[in-house]
Protein backbone atom coordinates (compact mmCIF):
# COMPACT_ATOMS: atom_id res chain seq x y z
CA UNK A 1 0.00 0.00 0.00
CA UNK A 2 1.43 3.40 -0.99
CA UNK A 3 2.13 5.86 1.78
CA UNK A 4 0.36 9.20 1.53
CA UNK A 5 2.59 12.27 1.58
CA UNK A 6 2.04 14.76 4.39
CA UNK A 7 2.86 18.45 3.94
CA UNK A 8 3.27 21.26 6.47
CA UNK A 9 2.68 24.80 5.18
CA UNK A 10 4.37 27.62 7.15
CA UNK A 11 2.94 30.91 5.90
CA UNK A 12 2.01 34.02 7.88
CA UNK A 13 -0.38 35.32 5.19
CA UNK A 14 -3.73 33.63 5.83
CA UNK A 15 -4.90 33.96 2.22
CA UNK A 16 -1.75 32.33 0.84
CA UNK A 17 -1.88 29.64 3.54
CA UNK A 18 -5.45 28.73 2.53
CA UNK A 19 -4.63 28.85 -1.19
CA UNK A 20 -1.70 26.46 -0.73
CA UNK A 21 -3.79 24.19 1.48
CA UNK A 22 -6.50 24.02 -1.18
CA UNK A 23 -3.89 23.19 -3.83
CA UNK A 24 -2.44 20.33 -1.78
CA UNK A 25 -5.92 19.05 -0.95
CA UNK A 26 -6.86 19.08 -4.65
CA UNK A 27 -3.76 16.97 -5.38
CA UNK A 28 -4.68 14.44 -2.68
CA UNK A 29 -2.03 15.34 -0.11
CA UNK A 30 -2.57 15.42 3.63
CA UNK A 31 -1.54 18.79 5.00
CA UNK A 32 -1.44 21.07 8.01
CA UNK A 33 -0.95 24.82 8.06
CA UNK A 34 0.74 27.05 10.62
CA UNK A 35 1.52 30.74 10.58
CA UNK A 36 4.99 31.02 12.14
CA UNK A 37 8.19 29.35 13.29
CA UNK A 38 7.17 28.43 16.84
CA UNK A 39 3.98 26.81 15.50
CA UNK A 40 6.10 24.94 12.93
CA UNK A 41 8.37 23.63 15.69
CA UNK A 42 5.34 22.38 17.63
CA UNK A 43 3.87 20.72 14.54
CA UNK A 44 7.18 18.98 13.73
CA UNK A 45 7.40 17.71 17.31
CA UNK A 46 3.83 16.43 17.17
CA UNK A 47 3.73 14.83 13.71
CA UNK A 48 5.85 13.49 10.84
CA UNK A 49 5.92 15.46 7.59
CA UNK A 50 7.45 14.58 4.26
CA UNK A 51 7.64 18.15 2.97
CA UNK A 52 7.54 21.56 4.60
CA UNK A 53 6.70 24.64 2.51
CA UNK A 54 8.06 27.75 4.25
CA UNK A 55 7.68 31.42 3.42
CA UNK A 56 11.05 33.13 3.90
CA UNK A 57 9.59 36.26 5.49
CA UNK A 58 8.55 35.26 9.00
CA UNK A 59 7.69 37.21 12.13
CA UNK A 60 10.10 36.78 15.02
CA UNK A 61 13.81 36.16 15.24
CA UNK A 62 14.08 33.33 12.66
CA UNK A 63 13.41 33.73 8.97
CA UNK A 64 12.25 30.91 6.71
CA UNK A 65 15.81 29.93 5.80
CA UNK A 66 16.60 29.33 9.48
CA UNK A 67 13.32 27.43 9.88
CA UNK A 68 14.26 25.29 6.88
CA UNK A 69 17.37 24.06 8.69
CA UNK A 70 15.22 22.74 11.54
CA UNK A 71 12.76 21.07 9.16
CA UNK A 72 15.58 19.50 7.14
CA UNK A 73 17.28 18.23 10.32
CA UNK A 74 14.05 16.36 11.09
CA UNK A 75 14.17 14.61 7.71
CA UNK A 76 11.69 16.78 5.82
CA UNK A 77 12.03 17.94 2.25
CA UNK A 78 11.88 21.73 2.18
CA UNK A 79 10.49 24.24 -0.31
CA UNK A 80 11.07 27.92 0.45
CA UNK A 81 8.88 30.65 -1.04
CA UNK A 82 9.37 34.40 -1.19
CA UNK A 83 8.02 37.46 -2.90
CA UNK A 84 11.18 39.41 -2.08
CA UNK A 85 13.76 39.01 -4.82
CA UNK A 86 16.46 40.30 -2.46
CA UNK A 87 16.42 36.82 -0.86
CA UNK A 88 17.40 34.97 -4.05
CA UNK A 89 21.15 34.88 -3.35
CA UNK A 90 20.62 33.49 0.16
CA UNK A 91 18.10 30.98 -1.19
CA UNK A 92 20.57 29.75 -3.79
CA UNK A 93 23.29 29.50 -1.15
CA UNK A 94 20.96 27.50 1.10
CA UNK A 95 20.79 24.68 -1.44
CA UNK A 96 17.05 24.33 -0.82
CA UNK A 97 14.30 24.25 -3.40
CA UNK A 98 12.64 27.64 -3.72
CA UNK A 99 9.93 29.44 -5.66
CA UNK A 100 9.53 33.17 -6.21
CA UNK A 101 6.05 34.58 -5.63
CA UNK A 102 3.86 34.80 -7.50
CA UNK A 103 4.31 31.25 -8.75
CA UNK A 104 2.03 28.83 -10.52
CA UNK A 105 0.64 26.10 -8.30
CA UNK A 106 1.66 23.57 -10.97
CA UNK A 107 5.28 24.66 -10.47
CA UNK A 108 4.93 24.02 -6.74
CA UNK A 109 3.56 20.53 -7.39
CA UNK A 110 6.43 19.86 -9.81
CA UNK A 111 8.94 20.69 -7.07
CA UNK A 112 7.03 18.47 -4.62
CA UNK A 113 7.28 15.59 -7.11
CA UNK A 114 11.03 16.21 -7.52
CA UNK A 115 11.54 16.04 -3.76
CA UNK A 116 9.48 12.87 -3.43
CA UNK A 117 11.35 11.23 -6.31
CA UNK A 118 14.73 12.12 -4.80
CA UNK A 119 13.61 10.81 -1.41
CA UNK A 120 12.47 7.55 -2.99
CA UNK A 121 15.79 7.17 -4.83
CA UNK A 122 17.71 7.83 -1.61
CA UNK A 123 15.66 5.16 0.16
CA UNK A 124 16.57 2.62 -2.55
CA UNK A 125 20.27 3.61 -2.36
CA UNK A 126 20.23 3.26 1.42
CA UNK A 127 18.69 -0.22 1.22
CA UNK A 128 21.26 -1.22 -1.39
CA UNK A 129 24.15 0.08 0.76
CA UNK A 130 22.77 -1.79 3.77
CA UNK A 131 22.95 -5.08 1.89
CA UNK A 132 19.35 -5.39 0.79
CA UNK A 133 18.97 -6.77 -2.69
CA UNK A 134 16.36 -6.38 -5.35
CA UNK A 135 14.37 -9.54 -6.03
CA UNK A 136 15.69 -11.68 -8.88
CA UNK A 137 13.94 -11.31 -12.23
CA UNK A 138 12.19 -14.05 -14.04
CA UNK A 139 11.59 -17.37 -12.67
For each feature predicted by the language model, list its residue ranges:
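C-terminal output helix
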Residues: 103-115, 120, 124-125
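Acidic, metal-coordinating helix/loop segments flanking the phosphotransfer/catalytic sites
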Residues: 8, 33-51, 59
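CheY-like receiver
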Residues: 118-139
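As written
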Residues: 90-100
Amino acid sequence: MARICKVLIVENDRYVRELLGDAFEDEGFLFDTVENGPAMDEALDRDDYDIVVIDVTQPGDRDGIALAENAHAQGCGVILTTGDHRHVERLEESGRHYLLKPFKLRNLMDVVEQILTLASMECVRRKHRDGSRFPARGG
